[in-house]
């Protein structure tokens, strides 16, 4: 336990997200600051949507809204998160008030595009959208309205970079473990305990 604490304190081995869900949360915090009191809309309540929604729910959000084509699935996830389910055909109402939109559906076409956003009364200059769907859920033309849009490839790059950084820290962690083990062996010799 002591050695683990020393490794965590003296290295960056546990810094940076390596999962797509955590990378999405980190990216949101980087662009929006503290997520406390932010409003989030999660579109898609499948595996990836759940993963990101659960990571976001830990951030003391003002509100988390969950939309899914199958409404009862949205209700289940929203209940798990103390959030609010959204009917899929009412997305427009929630898009215009969200600070962050995460989209992770299995749709074969765009769910959100510039035309759909223009039909709402929203101001999208401060809106962050993260599209983790494959194929894409959000058309890049939303950026013409001032939306900051990131996709799953951006998140993979973040996760891959963090994985590389962690691997660099492994050597330092091994040195600390070897050093601590040597100190332990020496202390056992001093008190007369046989070699380990």
Placement of each model-derived feature along the sequence:
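Glycine/serine-rich phosphate-binding loop and adjoining beta1-alpha1 elements at the start
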Residues: 1-35
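Conserved, well-folded catalytic cores of nucleic-acid-processing
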Residues: 3, 59, 80, 101-108, ...
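Conserved active-site and cofactor/substrate-binding residues in soluble primary-metabolism enzymes
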Residues: 15, 19, 43, 69-72, ...
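Glycine-rich phosphate/diphosphate-binding loop of Rossmann-like nucleotide-binding domains
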Residues: 25, 29-100
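Short, glycine-/Ser/Thr-/acidic-enriched flexible segments
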Residues: 47, 71-72, 107-108, 134-135, ...
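Short amphipathic alpha-helical segments
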Residues: 53-54, 78-79, 113-117, 140-143
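Rossmann-like NAD(P)-binding element
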Residues: 81-114, 122-130, 134-135
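Adenosine-phosphate binding glycine-rich loop
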Residues: 118-128, 132-196
């Amino acid at each position: 336990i002591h050695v683990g604490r020393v490794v965590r304190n003296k290295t960056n081995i546990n810094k940076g997200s390596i999962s797509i869900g955590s990378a999405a949360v980190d990216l949101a915090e980087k662009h929006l600051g503290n997520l406390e009191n932010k409003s989030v809309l999660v579109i898609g309540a499948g595996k990836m949507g759940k993963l990101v929604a659960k990571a976001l729910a830990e951030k003391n959000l003002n509100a988390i809204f969950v939309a899914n084509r199958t409404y009862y699935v949205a209700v289940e996830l929203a209940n798990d998160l103390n959030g609010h389910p959204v009917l899929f055909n009412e997305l427009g109402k929630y898009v215009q008030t969200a600070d962050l939109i995460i989209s992770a559906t299995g749709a074969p076409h765009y769910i959100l595009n510039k035309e759909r956003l223009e039909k709402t009364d929203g101001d999208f200059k401060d809106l962050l959208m993260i599209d983790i769907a494959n194929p894409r859920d959000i058309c890049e033309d939303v950026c013409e309205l001032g939306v900051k849009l990131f996709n799953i490839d951006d998140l993979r790059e973040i996760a891959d970079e963090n994985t590389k950084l962690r691997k660099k820290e492994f050597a330092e962690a091994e040195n600390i473990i070897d050093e601590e083990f040597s100190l332990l062996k020496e202390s056992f010799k001093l008190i007369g305990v046989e070699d380990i």
